């Protein structure tokens, strides 16, 4: 939380921590000579000396950066390779894709939890559906591409691409079955009991409801529809990715021709899929709302689309297509133009998944399967409405606020409540931000204030994902209009945000900003803003560094951390980062920051191995790490070695985890938990005990090959003692969570912690309470009268 609130009670002194850690430390496997002391190795981070990464604007990063010592020890080096005994056995690792599916099961478990408000359960079920869509469009599509290319190299868990596809299909069919069991057997009946009837089949309508929907169809739907036939003169219709369609088998009413015809119609996305009917009175005399899905109305009225034909069978269906972009950046003359071309192809990629009703006419299914070239393992026969993402729209229905969690309002940051000038506040000391518990407004205000401050000379920022009506973009454009030097790296390759980012890039260029499209072969995923300001004592650099995107919308839903600072060394590093991104620059070393792809992997490995060395020497050793995903084999193997050396390793990993935890002789000192709650856990935090001199870092990178090797990422230290204790407090509270945490078991499954006899700890709710309390205390100190009119922060709106 913000630095003005003092140290949390949960934090322990260095002496107390040392005693606790010493009691847990074990000296094992002392013969592992390959583990080196911190900083002892000087290899060059796994990149050949002549390798370079060229920027689209002409910048390049040289892998020949030389290691330096002293204050600049964090150079482009890599520790020696880890021993191969753990790495050689694929059974020591979990397949990435199967691990992701287990994460989606954890999200699904929230929709099955009856202690959660009903409409929140709808939301979680919708999220599992949208997650699965993206998983198929990207990950499954990539595996299919490998199979087509006859690529059969096993992954870290020893599975070939085809073996992965087979297991994914099996596990996904089980997941989908559980999704619809939850929907049909739990959610729909519970909705009905609480005043909302879902008409699941159009045959179930009353006469009045049928008449209403028929009139609705005639006035609002029929004019929009385009029925499409398939015969020798008309090819099979092109079906866009993720669209909902209704296929039909037809037989002509007149004549003796028994031949069946195939036709289809797309369910229009321009009309709301959820149609509300007149309210009804239930068995108890209470008013109840009634809704039906648009495809049910269309299916009921199919005869009006195919006059003089009998509808033999009709079934909704939906396909998923390969949406993974293939861009040859080296050959592209204009990266922006090339991405725009590829985006047009995304809607028409290879069909990789088919959803259709479970009672489908097999003759109709045969036609669809043949024309789309769909494998049997990629066909999902569904017992319920296709595409459960509509439940997110259901969540938005008004009148059901009692069945939703109270809306949390992000709190003001205490350190920024007493001064109007944000730069004055930052000069007083580094400021820690913890979103969404604390407001994202200070980040927006930082950029906006810089745009309007006459003393500001330049603003530089990286953008990966921003909101649809971004105040950050508006502030950058305003800054350029005010004559400031504005440089923005807009990452055009941010998946599924490519089109938005292209539009923002064009707008910023028109506003007079210098826009960089990213680096060839790399994604720029770092979150950094640099403001250069002329002050009485000369130039001062202000920096924001964060773990999450500059997106004011998702900042209300994702848990992230950030720091505002004017530390001169961080400012110098920030300048070097932007010089590296925008021009010809070859940083040899860094003062405070660690930057991927050349420097970050080696930094992490050295710190992990340092803890292992301390444990072997009989000293306390402890690692705490929080991230979205862990699937890097080299990092995992280093953690296994640390565990065997006696290092206690505690990790909070929301999503993918390819590490096996709690396995004797391998990882008995490693624990992993995944927190799934109202907010999406997104921050990356790393703690190393370091012989009772703890080091704490935050950053944009997960422990994944893509983050460490193929992206520009930044890790930054938290050096202020008070702020460091607060970040440690975040980790400690999440490690105590026994309400929303799922614990990884040695067999790879996840289980909720046994709460019997324990004080319940919901980390997200605790952070909400802490933020409310700190903001109130700060407001009361500023003006005691405000304590009587303090704004409530929990709202049902």
Language model region names:
Residues 628:
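Cofactor-pocket helix-loop regions in the catalytic cores of large enzyme subunits
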Residues 648-652:
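Hydrophobic alpha/beta core scaffold segments
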Residues 2-623, 641, 645, 657-797:
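N-terminal localization/anchoring segments of enzymes in phospholipid and broader phosphate metabolism
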Residues 633-636, 640:
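Glycine/threonine-rich ATP-lid/beta-loop region of ATP-binding domains
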